[in-house]
Amino acid sequence: MTDQADTAMPIQFTDAAAAKVKGLLEEEQNPALKLRVYVTGGGCSGFQYGFTFDEKVNDGDFTIEKQGVLLVVDPMSLQYLVGGEVDYTSGLEGSRFFVKNPNATTTCGCGASFSV
């Protein structure tokens, strides 16, 4: 496990995203949960982002702690997310976690998939 104290932060975790995770964990009443962001093949642009709650941190995972909650990224996904930012938005189109990724050369219209 690598955390922010060991290395420069290759990905950012915004206050808005951390606050939403904190609220969701309070609703679930399970403080062991962490937000995991990952990249998989698929979507209309080749790769897509995924978000899930996970109790485990695996060897090699990168973690960021903010507001008492953890964001976890596996090493394979991290290579596609370096320089990016995990954020949260709520508006007329709904609420969601999303990734601002400077490595993406193209994205689909909804922003859920990308190519590099």
From Swiss-Prot:
MF terms in GO: 2 iron, 2 sulfur cluster binding; 4 iron, 4 sulfur cluster binding; iron ion binding
Any GO BP: iron-sulfur cluster assembly
Named cofactor requirement(s): iron-sulfur cluster
NCBIfam families per record: iron-sulfur cluster assembly accessory protein, PRK13623.1
Family classification: Belongs to the HesB/IscA family.
HAMAP family in the cross-refs: Fe_S_insert_ErpA (MF_01380)
Protein name: Iron-sulfur cluster insertion protein ErpA
Species, as recorded: Shewanella baltica (strain OS155 / ATCC BAA-1091)
